[in-house]
């Protein structure tokens, strides 16, 4: 059966470069090494940034900051799909605006008078010698929202978070003890709306393959990996029908053995696959 969710045209993720150029991704905290967690500038470099001309800023970004990125995140170059994936994402400096790409599917389920709560998830890509893996979690059964379901690390954007990127990093640290030096964000996918009333912005990132998950016992029952190649293949993704709030509805689901990867998690992966297909 051909359903509308499989024929969605996603908006372009390309964003015109801002002027003046800035590496700031609004995750602003000076770490122990004297560098900002988000942009890898020193405090002095941040303070004098407004006094630099456009050429000086771009040179600093393309040389000094690029070298620091390679030094801090040495595992980045191990991701063979890095250039391909980065090219289809919204840049970190420009989180996607607007409604979720699946709004039309949920018009009769979402509150029209209330604003949706902002949330973020981390779509973690782990470069392994055997191929890139996608890091997933299974939530504990006792959680209020989506208990027992397979999901990405993430949650609601809190007041003190530095936007959706800050929320995704914080939640990943809280849920599975993913440290700042073990994750290198690449960019954003399109926002996705959930029946529980959240506008979810997926943050795609590379995770250090030496990272060892430590799941929070109150939130995460299990952490596991699935091959990226499997999840990006149309062969393994299907639509299933289910009864929900009075009518038959269609949801996406993977045929992965041992875990049910479906719903919002499957839809976010589908969004990434479609974007990659558009530039293939």
Q: Can you name each region flagged by the protein language model?
A:
Residues 23-44:
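Local cysteine-cluster metal-coordination motifs and their immediate loop/turn environment
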Residues 1-12:
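A broadly conserved sequence feature marking short terminus-proximal activation segments
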Residues 21, 46-47, 71:
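Compact, charge-rich alpha-helical regulatory domains located at protein termini
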Residues 8-9, 66-151, 156-211, 244-280:
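N-terminal leader/linker segments that precede catalytic domains of diphosphate-processing enzymes
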Residues 215-257:
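NUDIX/MutT-family hydrolases
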Residues 41, 50-60:
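Short cysteine/histidine-rich metal-coordination sites, predominantly Zn2+-binding motifs
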Residues 10-15, 21-29:
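Short, intrinsically disordered, charge-biased short linear motifs at domain edges
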């Amino acid at each position: 059966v051909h359903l509308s969710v499989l024929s969605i045209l996603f908006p372009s993720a390309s964003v015109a470069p801002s002027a003046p150029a800035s590496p700031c991704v609004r995750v602003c905290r000076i770490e122990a090494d004297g560098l900002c967690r988000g942009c890898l500038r020193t405090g002095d470099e941040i303070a004098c940034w407004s006094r630099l001309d456009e050429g000086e800023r771009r040179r600093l970004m393309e040389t000094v900051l690029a070298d620091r990125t390679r030094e801090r995140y040495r595992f980045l170059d191990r991701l063979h799909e890095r250039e391909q994936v980065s090219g289809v994402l919204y840049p970190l400096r420009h989180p996607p605006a607007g409604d979720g790409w699946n709004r039309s599917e949920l018009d009769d389920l979402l509150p029209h008078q209330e604003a949706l709560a902002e949330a973020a998830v981390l779509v973690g890509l782990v470069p392994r010698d055997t191929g890139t893996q996608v890091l997933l979690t299974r939530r504990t059964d006792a959680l209020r929202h989506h208990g027992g379901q397979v999901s990405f690390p993430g949650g609601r954007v809190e007041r003190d978070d530095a936007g959706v990127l800050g929320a995704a990093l914080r939640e990943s640290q809280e849920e599975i003890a993913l440290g700042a030096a073990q994750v290198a964000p690449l960019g954003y996918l399109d926002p996705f709306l959930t029946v529980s009333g959240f506008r979810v912005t997926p943050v795609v990132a590379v995770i250090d393959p030496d990272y060892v998950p430590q799941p929070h016992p109150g939130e995460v029952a299990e952490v596991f990996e699935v091959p990226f190649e499997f999840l990006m293949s149309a062969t393994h993704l299907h639509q299933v029908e289910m009864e929900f709030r009075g009518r038959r509805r269609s949801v996406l689901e993977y045929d992965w053995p041992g875990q049910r990867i479906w719903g919002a998690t499957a839809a976010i992966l589908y969004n990434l696959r479609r974007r990659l297909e558009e530039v293939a």
